[in-house]
């Protein structure tokens, strides 16, 4: 198992409800171990830990882009 951390930047003005939906849908992807927003310092930053042997990063980013087409990913 190869675990990778990834940071996805989303629009800072997304509502709390939309951020919760993104978090849940990303977390529900096969191969994702955890996905959480940094609610205090960077509420637009979704931190994802996933198994890159199971799910490609683009698939995870595509989930976030359903809610914010301009979402971008940064490897950690």
Predicted regions and their residues:
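Short acidic amphipathic segments
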Residues: 14, 23-40
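A generic structural motif
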Residues: 44-49
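Helix N-cap motif at beta-to-alpha junctions
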Residues: 50-55
């Amino acid at each position: 198992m190869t675990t990778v951390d990834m940071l996805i930047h989303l629009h800072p003005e997304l509502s709390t409800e939309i951020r919760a939906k993104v978090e849940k849908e990303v977390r529900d992807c096969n191969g994702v171990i955890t996905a959480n927003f940094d609610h205090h310092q960077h509420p637009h930053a979704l931190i994802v830990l996933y198994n890159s042997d199971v799910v490609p990063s683009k698939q995870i980013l595509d989930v976030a882009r359903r809610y914010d087409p301009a979402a971008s990913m940064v490897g950690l």
